[in-house]
Structures are given as structure tokens and as C-alpha cells.
Amino acid sequence: LWGAGFLYFRLPGTMAGLAAIGFGVAALAGLVGVWSGEARLPLGFAVLFVSLLGWWSSFHPSHDRDWIPELARLPAIAQEGDVLTVSNLRNFRWRTEEDYDQHWETRRYDLAKVTGADIFLSYWSGEAIAHLLVSFTFSDSVPLTFSIEVRREKGEDWSALAGFFRSYEMAYVAADERDIVGLRTHARKEDARLFRLSASPRQARDLLLAYAGDINDLAAKPRWYNTLTTNCTTVVYHL
């Protein structure tokens, strides 16, 4: 299944379907060979599978693609004492998903002023699937919100299945809360729910610094998004 899926989502046009079917037939022939004692069939499939693994390993994530505007820039965070400087912070004004004003900003936040952290769950496919955002609150400024996104290229559609097969890079978005929550509640008409965490200010600061470290790591070295293992929930859990 993995090999057929990889071929289907990584090859263009009708070639993708034909290659996936061909791989499935080869796998079936290999199983028949194991059952019948015909060694050439499973050996042939093993060679095919190893070749496919070699092709898989040749795919590398990149920051250098023609990204959609809202994911065109990755944030970076510099720390000097208790002050965090967040560059490439998104503060768009959304009227619809296609009609918006672009604003990228640099903002500074005082770690000593962190008061807590909130979670937003934005449900976009009934109750089954939600996108997670983490928002940090401060006593002297507006919240700072982070989201982990599929970094799509212009003209590229999102597919949960394609996300298993090195089809998308991962992106962090650092944003004004009105931008990133408003995009989902107003422009996309999603059902967003706010959960206030019981974390202490110190715990919230520690989580914020963990975000800062991983954001800078991603800016230095791109990663693949994976629907199961590297998504908006699992990455936050590992932080």
C-alpha cells in the first residue's frame, strides 16, 4: 500500500495511477511467488521495492519554492535577556480567503510579562478533525499565536493522504491572534473553540521558549509535513 500510494501521489497525471496499479500487481505476483515457490517473483519485487526506497530517499524538503502568500515567510525568533524579537510575524487582514491585505511585522515580547497560554481548536470537517493553535498571553501586549501548517505552493491542493508521502513541507506561522483565528472563523467559517490552559506563567514561558527553539531550527533546516507524525498536534506534543 505504501509503495502504491507513494507512486500515486508523486507521479504526474495518468502515469501515477498506472504506476500504482503496476506496483500493486508486482506485489501480488511476489506474494504468489512466495506461496508457489517461484523465487524469481519475490526477488523481482524486492529489487523493485528497494529501488522505490532509493527514489523516496532522494526527495528532500526545501524552503525555496513558490509558496502561497500567507505561508511565504517563516518566522524567526531572537532572544536577548527576557526580550523575544519575532520577525516575519503575520498580521493579515482577511475579508475572504482570496481577498486580504498582507502585513508582515517584527514584534517584541517580554518573557517577564507572560501570563499564560490558550489553545484554540478549529473544527473544519465536523467533529472529527480540528486544527490546533497555541496562543500566549501577556500583561502588556496582545497575544502571540503559533500554528503549524502544511506549507503549500501556489496552485497546490491539500490532501490528507498525500501528506503521508513527502508531498508538503511543514511551516510555522507566528501571527497576531486576530489574523490567524479570524482567518478560520470568519473567512473559512470554521468552528473555533477556545480552551484556557491552567499552566502557570513559568510553564507558559517554558513552552514559548520551546516554540522559539523549534521555529529557529525549522528556519535553518526544512522538514517534511506528515499527516500522522508531523502535524499541528504531534509537533506541539513533543515540544
Model-derived segments and spans:
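Alpha-helical transmembrane signal-anchor/signal-peptide segments
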Residues: 61-80
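Extended acidic/polar, glycine-enriched regions
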Residues: 49, 58, 77-80, 84
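A short, structured loop/turn motif at beta-sheet edges
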Residues: 79-83, 137-141, 199-204
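Active-site nucleophile-His-acid catalytic modules used for acyl/amide transfer and hydrolysis
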Residues: 175-238
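Glycine-rich catalytic cores of cysteine/serine-nucleophile enzymes that process amide/ester linkages
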Residues: 84, 89, 95-192
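Membrane-embedded alpha-helical segments of integral membrane proteins
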Residues: 1-33
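Transmembrane alpha-helices and immediately adjacent membrane-cytoplasm interface residues
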Residues: 28-63
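Hydrophobic/aromatic-rich, well-ordered segments within soluble, folded domains that form packed cores
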Residues: 79, 83-91, 228-239
